[in-house]
Swiss-Prot record:
Belongs to the cytochrome c oxidase subunit 2 family. Its EC number is 7.1.1.9. Component of the cytochrome c oxidase, the last enzyme in the mitochondrial electron transport chain which drives oxidative phosphorylation. The respiratory chain contains 3 multisubunit complexes succinate dehydrogenase (complex II, CII), ubiquinol-cytochrome c oxidoreductase (cytochrome b-c1 complex, complex III, CIII) and cytochrome c oxidase (complex IV, CIV), that cooperate to transfer electrons derived from NADH and succinate to molecular oxygen, creating an electrochemical gradient over the inner membrane that drives transmembrane transport and the ATP synthase. This is Cytochrome c oxidase subunit 2. Its cofactor is Cu cation. It is found in: Mitochondrion inner membrane. Mg(2+) binds at E198. Cu cation A1 binds at H161, C196, C200, M207. It catalyses: 4 Fe(II)-[cytochrome c] + O2 + 8 H(+)(in) = 4 Fe(III)-[cytochrome c] + 2 H2O + 4 H(+)(out). The gene is MT-CO2. Residues 1-14, 88-227 are mitochondrial intermembrane.
Length: 227
């Protein structure tokens, strides 16, 4: 969950988000080292006579500034590719939920059940109860079992949308006529908030997403009460 004046990313709730946080720290450290090196060279140029205006050929330097960036790019690309393949890998999901984007609400269908579907609208500010979050609460939450692999099928009925839940490391485009898929697995119970992350019209800011992750026994009771 995000909070005011937050400087970092949201706490990771899924294995994918933990990997993304590690990759973020890894890349940020590389950027910090490069920036420090550049600032050090600039300071030397300003404070000493570190100039080579008459140099016509420097093969050693050219070799270094060719090989060193290549090594840095490899150090960034390899962990990035690993995470990309992890995000695309879906093996034997325990549950499949189909998500459809509309202007300006979400609809959900639990495809493993015969008749379990609903629409999810934002609760207007004037109808919020004490303690509820402005522009983030919905009338129907998406209840899911924790510690299980869940496949999300995402599409749109009208324009481009994007289904995003930051604490789970999820962001998948909802494209009309195309069915995208992603996977999630939450390690802790709780409420996880997200929003539409693709500008989709005048009420784009009013398309929140709320996932309620509960133990499997609670999920079975909830689904049985709706069937």
């Amino acid at each position: 969950m995000a909070y005011p004046f937050q400087m970092g990313l949201q706490d990771a709730t899924s294995p994918i988000m933990e990997e993304l946080l590690h990759f973020h720290d890894h890349t940020l450290m590389i950027v910090f080292l490069i920036s420090s090196l550049v600032l050090y060279i600039i300071s030397l140029m300003l404070t000493t006579k570190l100039t080579h205006t008459s140099t016509m050929d420097a093969q050693e330097v050219e070799t270094i500034w060719t090989i060193l960036p290549a090594i840095i790019l490899i150090l960034i690309a390899l962990p990035s590719l690993r995470i990309l393949y992890m995000m695309d890998e879906i093996n034997n999901p325990s549950l499949t939920v189909k998500t459809m984007g509309h202007q300006w609400y979400w609809s959900y269908e639990y495809t493993d059940y015969e008749d379990l579907s609903f629409d999810s609208y934002m609760i207007p500010t004037q109808e919020l109860k004490p303690g509820e979050l402005r522009l983030l609460e919905v009338d129907n939450r998406v209840v899911l079992p924790m510690e299980l692999t869940i496949r999300m099928l995402i599409s749109s009925e009208d324009v481009l949308h994007s289904w995003a839940v930051p604490s789970l490391g999820l962001k998948t485009d909802a494209i009309p006529g195309r069915l995208n898929q992603t996977t999630l697995m939450a390690m802790r119970p709780g409420l996880y908030y997200g929003q539409c992350s693709e500008i989709c019209g005048s009420n784009h800011s009013f398309m929140p997403i709320v996932l309620e992750l509960v133990p499997l026994s609670h999920f079975e009771k909830w689904s049985a009460s709706l069937l």
